[in-house]
């Protein structure tokens, strides 16, 4: 009884009156009006270390960059706080690199032949494959959900730029774009007012993280854990945010519960290609209606059953789809999962997740770059 009262209190604090439909509709209308008068000034500011840069020079440049980051971050966060209170080029698809004959990761010729995937050519303004995205995952309201919330914002943002710079050095010549991957809809064991076993983040949290990304020229991902809700309903709430050019989308099948199961149990959730296709359709319409660059959609996966009928995912040039290998463990087990559940079920692009605490040991950028195809999306939790 006591735990129920505590959870209910926290829900009320986060969401005010809970998930009342009238409040959600009004919130979206206010948001829509706000965005309609704000020009889309965002443009990506990637990190690039040229092929020709000597190793010592690259390291020196990295140190100089990091020395200046803390001062910049403090000023930016101060400006953001005041604001809150006051109110392509196309890169060849083969650039992922053919698999090496020797190394940590070896795949068969038949698996290698699946890549690169036949897909619509990237449209102007596309993030992929010209960039590699390096993201910090989590939620600023929780220290247990990932590094995005585990560290103070100022420290977290500086650390993300440092990690992204390390990736740029490890794969010189490839642009690296940092990203903040926010769990915007959080699956939970408590049913909540809507009895959907999920908690929608309030506008203030989403806007805060979006502002951090926007002012730095980074990306932001809104991650949906639907609980016992569905992609269609949960996506409607986030559509206004997705009108920003730097805001992207992610789906987490692990917490898409079916057959009466609940989050937080031993049961694994799953999504079907039809649900992914719905998200692709929504994103494509947003891109078309608001004349935005193509969106990026990340779908987490670390078992075969998490994503059913993956071969039926319908690609659209306005949406670039990444299947992100989301499992933790030893390097060998992670590479095996990447081979079995991502490489052998090609969709379009690939991602790879790294866990600071659960990977034993955590793979280095150089080790991850041994994978084929090379992941274009790297996520840290």
Model regions: which residues?
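Positively charged n-region of N-terminal signal peptides that target proteins for export
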Residues: 1-4
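Bacterial N-terminal signal peptides
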Residues: 7-14
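Alpha/beta catalytic barrel-like cores
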Residues: 18-199, 315-319, 332-381
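Active-site beta-loop-alpha junctions enriched in small/polar residues
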Residues: 139-141, 183-187, 225-227, 254-256, ...
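Substrate-binding cleft of extracellular glycoside hydrolase catalytic domains
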Residues: 166, 175-254
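Acidic, His- and aromatic-enriched active-site or binding-groove loops in soluble protein domains
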Residues: 203-206, 242-250, 273-277, 318-333
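Aromatic-lined carbohydrate-recognition surfaces of secreted/lumenal glycan-active proteins
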Residues: 226-231, 288-306
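Substrate-binding surface in catalytic domains of secreted glycosidases
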Residues: 253-292
């Amino acid at each position: 009884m006591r735990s129920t009262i505590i959870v209910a209190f926290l829900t009320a604090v986060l969401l005010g009156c809970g998930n009342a439909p009238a409040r959600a509709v009004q919130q979206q209308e206010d948001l829509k009006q706000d965005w309609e008068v704000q020009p889309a000034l965002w443009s990506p500011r990637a990190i690039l270390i040229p092929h020709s840069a000597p190793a010592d020079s690259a390291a020196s440049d990295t140190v100089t960059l990091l020395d200046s980051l803390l001062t910049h971050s403090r000023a930016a966060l101060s400006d953001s706080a005041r604001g809150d209170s006051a109110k392509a080029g196309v890169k060849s698809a083969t650039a992922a690199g053919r698999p090496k004959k020797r190394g940590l990761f070896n795949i068969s010729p038949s698996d290698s032949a699946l890549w690169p995937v036949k897909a619509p050519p990237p449209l102007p303004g596309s993030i992929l494959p010209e960039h590699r995205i390096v993201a910090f995952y989590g939620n600023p309201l929780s220290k247990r959900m990932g590094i995005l919330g585990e560290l103070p914002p100022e420290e977290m943002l500086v650390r993300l730029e440092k990690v992204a710079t390390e990736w740029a050095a490890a794969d010189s010549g490839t642009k690296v774009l940092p990203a903040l991957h926010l769990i915007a809809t959080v699956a939970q064991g408590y049913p909540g007012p809507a009895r959907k076993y999920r908690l929608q983040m309030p506008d203030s949290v989403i806007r805060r993280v979006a502002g951090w990304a926007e002012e730095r020229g980074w990306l932001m991902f809104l991650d949906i854990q639907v609980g016992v809700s569905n992609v269609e309903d949960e996506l409607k709430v986030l559509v206004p945010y997705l009108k920003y050019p730097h805001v992207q989308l992610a789906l987490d099948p692990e917490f898409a519960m079916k057959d009466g199961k609940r989050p937080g149990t031993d049961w694994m959730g799953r999504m079907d290609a039809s649900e992914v296709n719905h998200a692709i359709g929504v994103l494509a319409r947003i891109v078309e209606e608001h004349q935005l660059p193509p969106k990026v959609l990340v779908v987490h996966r670390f078992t075969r059953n998490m994503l059913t009928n993956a071969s039926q995912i319908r690609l659209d040039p306005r949406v670039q789809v990444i299947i992100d290998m989301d499992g933790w463990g030893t390097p060998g087990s992670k590479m095996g999962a990447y081979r079995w559940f991502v490489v052998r079920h090609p969709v379009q692009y690939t991602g790879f997740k790294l866990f600071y605490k659960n990977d034993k040991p955590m793979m280095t950028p150089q080790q991850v770059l041994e994978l084929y195809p090379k992941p274009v999306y790297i996520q840290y939790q």
